[in-house]
């Protein structure tokens, strides 16, 4: 998967000055979290297979609905593991899967590796990256479709599926006997209004996935979760987890529980900063004749593309952007898109690096323009 091979972690952070490829807020130091934790007192045993009870209670408390309890939460080593567990526990070769594309690579590659029949519902710039719910639901085959996968807010476009539309998809999936997987990793980072309730509240066949990585800037504590109110489905996910990792890291889950216990203090300044960063990009885009995008509704990423009348060597653009300007973005092929598109991450760099990176985009585009 190129998104992993070409990730900034593998490329080397020391080769990048302005990192606009990241899909999370800035990484945080343990000392900055203000946690009152005594790591020396932790017993480094196998933990609760479902996850730390205090962490599960905190996740349930943030669900925005009374339908979700701590017993419905399965903690996993990152959201990627949760996505993997859903696919591997629910799919067999030949099973029909409907996936909204672009999507996180795990949601595409794992069903492919299993040998499932993957049907992609592609979003388009011309439609504002908006999900056509009727068209998506028309792809669901009663008795044949086993899994439907959506993301909201969406990565890499930042568009949001309205709660009423998520409910419609949940109904269609349930009527067909399919599981609905909703990746809600950016749920806490909406740009207008409060986050919606977890989609898992919509039915026992719905799984919500999220993590500490994107909104909290804590990818180093590998902590994600899957939320499901259906007992049978939840048991399948737990069994899959036990086969792969048994339980999570005692240290990681303890730290995550401490952060989520202070969620009401931790999140507001993060959300305010994300909106300030979006304003920087808004101002830059307002003066653009080279690039265009659909303004994201949530998250810290947007999918930018060259305007249709801009003649450019996109391979040269990405090459000189890094080599000459020290700036890195997520090229379109990470998301099975043309490299005339790229994911712009505005949540991770400093404000100064963000502004410098935006200027670098213009400079690199000028260098790569075709006659």
Regions found by a protein language model. Name each.
Residues 114, 143, 175-176, 288, ...:
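Helix C-cap/helix->beta junction micro-motif
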Residues 89-150:
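PLP-dependent aminotransferase-like
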Residues 95, 116, 175-178, 204:
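A short helix->loop->beta-strand "cap" motif at the edges of active sites that frequently abuts
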Residues 21, 257, 273-281, 293-306, ...:
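Conserved glycine-rich beta-strand-loop-beta hairpin in the small C-terminal domain of fold type I
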């Amino acid at each position: 998967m190129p998104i992993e091979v070409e990730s900034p972690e593998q490329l080397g952070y020391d080769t990048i000055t302005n990192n606009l490829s990241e899909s999370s807020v800035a990484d945080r130091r343990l000392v900055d979290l203000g946690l009152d934790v005594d790591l020396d007192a932790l017993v480094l045993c196998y933990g609760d297979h479902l996850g730390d009870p205090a962490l599960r209670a905190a996740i349930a408390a943030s669900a925005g609905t009374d339908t979700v309890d701590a017993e419905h939460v399965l903690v996993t080593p990152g959201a990627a593991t949760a996505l993997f567990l859903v696919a591997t526990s629910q799919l067999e070769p030949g099973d029909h899967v409907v996936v909204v594309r672009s999507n996180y690579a795990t949601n595409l590659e794992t069903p492919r590796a299993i040998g499932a029949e993957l049907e992609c519902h592609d979003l388009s710039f011309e439609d504002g990256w908006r999900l056509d719910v009727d068209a998506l639901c028309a792809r669901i085959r009663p008795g044949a479709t086993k899994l439907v996968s959506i993301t909201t807010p969406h990565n890499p476009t930042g568009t949001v599926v309205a709660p009423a539309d998520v409910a419609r998809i949940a109904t269609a999936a349930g009527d067909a006997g399919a599981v609905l997987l909703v990746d809600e990793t950016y749920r806490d980072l909406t740009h207008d209004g409060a986050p919606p309730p977890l989609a898992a509240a919509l039915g026992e066949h719905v799984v919500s996935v999220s993590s500490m990585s994107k909104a909290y800037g804590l990818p180093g504590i590998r902590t994600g979760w899957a939320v499901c109110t259906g007992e049978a489905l939840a048991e399948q996910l737990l069994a899959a987890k036990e086969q792969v990792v048994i339980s999570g890291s005692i240290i990681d889950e303890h730290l995550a529980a401490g952060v989520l216990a202070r969620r009401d203090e931790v999140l507001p300044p993060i959300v305010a900063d994300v909106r300030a960063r979006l304003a920087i990009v808004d101002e830059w885009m307002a003066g653009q004749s080279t690039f265009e995008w659909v303004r994201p509704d949530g998250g810290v990423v947007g999918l930018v593309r060259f305007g249709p009348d801009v003649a450019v060597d996109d391979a040269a653009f990405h090459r000189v952007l890094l080599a000459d300007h020290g700036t890195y973005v997520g090229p379109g092929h990470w998301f099975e898109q043309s490299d005339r598109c790229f994911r712009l991450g505005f949540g991770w760099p400093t404000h100064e690096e963000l502004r410098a990176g935006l200027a670098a985009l213009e400079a690199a585009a000028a260098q790569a323009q075709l006659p």
